[in-house]
């Protein structure tokens, strides 16, 4: 995928949301590129970048120009041989408010994230922003209630999950429904258990397996906002 084109399209979406009054904008997991973790390929490490780096500068300028807080999800090159799946929160003035490095790393067929990412070392600490204290987690973290609880205990005002999850092409309709409902239910449960709103933002659409070993992933979208009683607002 053309990363420059992707970032341009993301910027267009961010600008549109800001015009419609959004103050907090959350992007999906690893949004700059295709979900490269479908395969184990050393060439994909070329997608990684430092933080701060080109992407934080790009989204920082958008945040400052539009007066919005942006939650990004980046492939961080921290040091030679050390890489993370990192959410970076950009404040309204364009500065980095904080970051969270994904702690729970999957290693399932078509989700070979352990090949790329070292588990985070920043703990579960909410990020203070002008729109509140954001408990930012990433995708697979959503299956673990402890992550949500630790963020809540540290004073988070809202739980946020940039995500990349989808169906295998061979899943039956019944299995697809079970998976999607489990995904929604577990995060609505985090909202109820902790008395906090939850925002989940997922990829959407089909992405082929570049290696041809599998039939690709159909990312199911279904992004939502739930209130503190698990009620769906969006």
Stretch-by-stretch model annotation:
Residues 117-131:
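Glycine-/acidic-rich phosphate or pyrophosphate-binding loops and their flanking alpha/beta elements
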Residues 75-77, 102-105, 139, 203-204:
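Active-site beta-loop-alpha junctions enriched in small/polar residues
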Residues 5-15, 144-151:
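Short, acidic/polar
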